[in-house]
């Protein structure tokens, strides 16, 4: 009988402690800011912009890491015929960002982005500014993407025919594609990519 009483008391104590624990957890969760409880994008534009800005930051990092006297660097020792030099890669990505989001807005995109377009930027500071301007523009336009216009048709020679949502995704992919290429340009010049340095990765990027 004593054993049963002790067991019953232990069970009651356990239930009481569990209730107290749950109450404490509930109080802690309700005291947290709303952003910490549900820190996810609240719109279609936000769902893409975080990844776009991350890709842009990575690309800008490699563009800034390469010394200006290496902006004319072209890989050798393999099948690199007719590839762009480092500076041309940066200019191409900047031009493409303007092109994609010009098409998003129904505007005429710049011509010849394959070669960097007609923007006169040539020096490293000029190309970095051109790149930053293109990123600022793309984020400004992306902010207008909504559930109502996401599937609107977009025409254009760069990413059309497509939808506004689709062309936004293409813009993210395009930056990451060229980021991967420029990582090799940096490493061929003995430079560790900034993102690798930041996270101290031992292999890969």
Model-derived features with residue positions:
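N-terminal targeting signals for Sec/Tat export/insertion, comprising classic cleavable signal peptides
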Residues: 33-73
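Bacterial N-terminal signal peptides
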Residues: 7-16
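Solvent-exposed, charged/polar functional surfaces in cytosolic regulatory/catalytic domains
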Residues: 54, 58-61, 65, 137-144, ...
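Residues within well-ordered alpha-helical secondary structure of globular protein domains
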Residues: 12, 65, 92-95, 133
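Positively charged n-region of N-terminal signal peptides that target proteins for export
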Residues: 1-4
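Short, helix-capping/interhelical loops that line the mouth of catalytic, cofactor-
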Residues: 23-47, 95-158, 189-205
């Amino acid at each position: 009988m004593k054993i049963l009483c002790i067991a019953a008391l232990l069970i009651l104590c356990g239930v009481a402690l569990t209730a107290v624990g749950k109450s404490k957890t509930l109080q802690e969760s309700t005291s947290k800011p709303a952003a910490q409880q549900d820190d996810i994008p609240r719109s279609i534009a936000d769902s893409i912009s975080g990844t776009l800005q991350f890709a842009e930051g990575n690309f800008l990092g490699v563009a800034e890491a390469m010394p200006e006297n290496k902006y004319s660097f072209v890989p050798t020792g393999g099948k690199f015929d007719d590839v762009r030099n480092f500076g041309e890669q940066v200019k191409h990505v900047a031009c493409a960002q303007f092109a994609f989001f010009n098409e998003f807005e129904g505007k005429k995109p710049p011509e010849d982005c394959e070669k960097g377009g007609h923007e006169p930027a040539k020096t490293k500071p000029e190309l970095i500014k051109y790149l930053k301007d293109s990123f600022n523009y793309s984020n400004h336009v992306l902010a207008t993407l909504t559930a109502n216009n996401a599937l609107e048709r977009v025409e254009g020679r760069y990413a059309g025919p497509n939808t506004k949502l689709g062309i936004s995704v293409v813009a993210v992919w395009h930056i990451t594609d060229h980021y991967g290429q420029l990582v090799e340009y940096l490493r061929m010049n003995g430079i560790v990519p900034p993102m690798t340095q930041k996270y101290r990765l031992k292999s890969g990027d």
